[in-house]
Amino acid sequence: LPIAEVGAILKNHSAIFHTDAVQAYGSEVILPHELGIDLLSISAHKINGPKGVGFLFKSDAIQLPPLLHGGEQEEKRRAGTENLAGIIGMGTAVSLLTSTEKQARKTAYQSFQTIILKALEEANIDFSINGEPTNRLAHVLNLHLKGIPSDLLLMHLDLRGIAISTGSACTAGTVDPSHV
């Protein structure tokens, strides 16, 4: 379901709605209050910011218990020293990501998808798009290439300077399919 529909369904329930917006934040306009989102996670490295830092949007209606005890940071939810350089780097990356930049990225990614799909068709490669064929993020193209081992494809494309993944970061290093 689209995020707005999920938010509308959950609006009259006691469920807390969290969405992982790491992939979408760099190319989509996300308005948590309009979408009914209570919690939203973002990672800086997806928008050209530093690795290892992100942010959590929290609706004012949500109360979160502390993760670590012993300090006053983060409204008494997380004791410890924050990664100030990472936070500043992420803030800079966010400030540079205007709606015009998001649209430019989205347009470029859609062009890349069109080029890739056309090249596969012209090469008579048997493939299918996993998931929704039209309503998907412009920068995510999830394909099944029939009869081509993923490790072989990964190696050959890497040697040609093309970066792909054959699974999620959660399953890196394993050949087993994701449980999700």
Which residue stretches match the model-derived regions?
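Pyridoxal 5′-phosphate
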Residues: 1-180
